[in-house]
Design a protein with these regions (language model features):
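N-terminal, membrane-interfacial amphipathic/helix-forming hydrophobic leader that caps
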Residues: 1-81, 90-91, 116-117, 230-242
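Membrane-helix interface segments
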Residues: 11, 77-78, 88-93, 138-139, ...
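Hydrophobic alpha-helical transmembrane segments
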Residues: 13-17, 53-54, 93-98, 139-143, ...
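Functionally important transmembrane alpha-helices
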Residues: 26-32, 177, 183-186, 193-242
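Juxtamembrane helix-loop-helix connectors linking adjacent transmembrane helices
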Residues: 37-53, 77-149, 167, 239-242
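Hydrophobic core segments of transmembrane alpha-helices in multi-pass, intramembrane catalytic enzymes
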Residues: 59-64, 145, 197-205
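Structural signal for membrane-spanning alpha-helices in multi-pass inner-membrane proteins
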Residues: 67-72, 103, 107, 111, ...
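Membrane-interface helix/loop boundary segments of multi-pass membrane proteins
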Residues: 152-178, 207-214
Length: 242
């Protein structure tokens, strides 16, 4: 095999891995599985089902992380080196905590500007996930899903996809732009304003990973952000999409 053919094969393989791990194929798979099992996405009142969201999120997380680590192993890549780098855990953890107020500030500022300049982008008056937070059990399930499928899964997923772009698909910056847009579209259910804000946050978390080569700070800040958002919803302070 010539070097050009080898490079092309690596690019196609990397593209396949990125598409499989972007989030949509695996979620569609489990949407189909849950449908075949007779598990509905909404309850009798038409509200999103917390059981459905929890099962979908956790199942997708397990499969997606399995695929990511499988693909890394196939190329004999070290997950510890890729996801944790050489920075000290304590320093990255504290940095992640310090990032959280900045993330919240960016979110609130962006939401205010978007609602003022382009009010039509707020096509979903109320975040549909707020209707799930009706009992302590629901809050616990939703928070667990937000931490595992949101904070942890999404940051490992982002790091893996940026790695593949950096290696074979035009560079990390290209990957950062493309996956940030995909990340935003994945939250379109919460409104176009939320999709734009989420894309911006994805770009920020991705940039931090590329600069520090560790997911600890992004996982901590993303997880903390999700928890704070849930608390704001519970107290009625926030009605914005996240």
């Amino acid at each position: 095999m010539t070097p050009e053919n080898s490079k092309r094969n690596q690019q196609w393989t990397a593209l396949f891995e990125v598409v499989i791990c972007c989030g949509f194929p695996t979620q569609l798979l489990f949407v189909g599985i849950l449908a075949m099992l007779g598990i509905a996405s909404t309850d009798t009142s038409g509200t999103l089902s917390i059981s459905y969201i929890f099962l979908l999120s956790i199942s997708d997380t397990i499969l997606l992380l399995f695929l990511i680590f499988y693909f890394l192993r196939q190329r004999q890549e070290n997950p510890v080196e890729i996801f944790l780098g050489r920075r000290q855990f304590r320093g990255e953890f504290l940095f992640g905590l310090m990032l959280t107020p900045l993330i919240l500030g960016i979110t609130l500022t962006s939401a205010t500007l978007l609602h003022h300049l382009w009010p039509t982008l707020r096509n979903v008056p109320e975040n549909p996930f707020t209707a799930l937070l009706t009992s302590p059990m629901n809050v616990a399930l939703f928070t667990t899903a937000a931490v595992i499928a949101g904070g942890i899964r999404e940051e490992l997923q982002r790091a893996f996809i940026l790695l593949r772009f950096d290696q074979h698909l035009g560079g990390a910056k290209v990957g950062l732009v493309i996956f940030s847009l995909v990340f935003g579209l994945g939250h379109a259910l919460q409104g176009w304003d939320a999709a734009i804000i989420t894309a911006l946050l994805g770009a920020l978390w991705g940039s931090i990973y590329l600069l520090r080569r560790s997911v600890i700070s992004t996982i901590v800040s993303h997880t903390s952000f999700n928890i704070v958002e849930i608390l704001l919803f519970l107290t009625g302070v926030s009605n914005s999409s996240s």
